[in-house]
A protein has these predicted regions:
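Cys-dependent protein tyrosine phosphatase-like superfamily
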Residues: 1-91
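Short cysteine clusters
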Residues: 94
């Protein structure tokens, strides 16, 4: 997993796995934000699967799936709200 540090307390990467959730937890991440729609790729774990694993680790999960064709001011406001309220450090992932 290649993690990019975007700001203090906020990182991102491509799709994560259940094992990578454990790694993020070990690194001190407190919340995970998923911007990827379920079913985008056959090998992609469903968000519910990741949520169950994350909950067992004590991570807070947020789900705001979108397609780039659907980007709007409303979506950006929702994204901003989630990023602001998510316990830090937070990690977001997409495709």
């Amino acid at each position: 997993m290649h993690i990019k540090n975007l700001t203090d307390g906020y990182t991102c990467s491509a799709q994560i796995s259940k094992d990578e959730l454990k790694h993020l937890h070990e690194q001190g991440v407190k919340s995970v934000i998923c911007f990827r729609p379920d079913g985008e790729h056959p090998e992609q774990p469903e968000f519910d699967t990741l949520t169950r694993e994350a909950s067992e680790l004590g991570l807070v999960c947020y789900y705001l799936p979108y397609d780039v064709a659907q980007v709007s001011a409303e979506l950006m406001q929702q994204m901003h709200r989630i990023i602001e309220e998510a316990p830090k450090p937070a990690h977001a992932f997409c495709k």
